[in-house]
Amino acid sequence: MRGDLEWGTIPGLVRSAARRYGEVEAVVDGRTRVSYAELGARVERAAAACVANGVRVGDRVAIWAPNSLDWIGAALGAVSAGAVLVPLNTRFKGGEAADVLARSRAKLLFITGTFLGTSYVASLRRAAGRAAAGGTVAGGAV
């Protein structure tokens, strides 16, 4: 059977896989292993977080994180909430990320703490501080 007819949507595929494959291993991220059922629950929590933060169908939700279990859950959760996904390159500096966030009008950002020795949160705060002081970030003012 064609997947698009069976599941209809990506969220439908996630729910179907959680039901169909349950405790079968779905994702391995370092030492962390999760089943399809666990992945489905993570996706539902991320979707609920989007909705609780005011995300509506068609809103943009950004993710600034490396490929990981958390990225998968956040991305599928955002899509499940009806959002348009805005993935940010992990090599971006704070100003570049701030520029993409502003241009995309992202309503919500899923962000990792630190990756490759860089604190993404601190990087964004520095960019916001420069913009508040009248400076610019890559691509223009924020």
Feature map (PLM): residue ranges:
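Conserved AMP-binding/adenylate-forming core of the ANL superfamily
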Residues: 2, 6, 11, 15, ...
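Short amphipathic alpha-helical surface micro-motifs
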Residues: 7-10, 16, 44-45, 120-133
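Structural core segment of the AMP-binding/adenylate-forming
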Residues: 52-53, 83-142
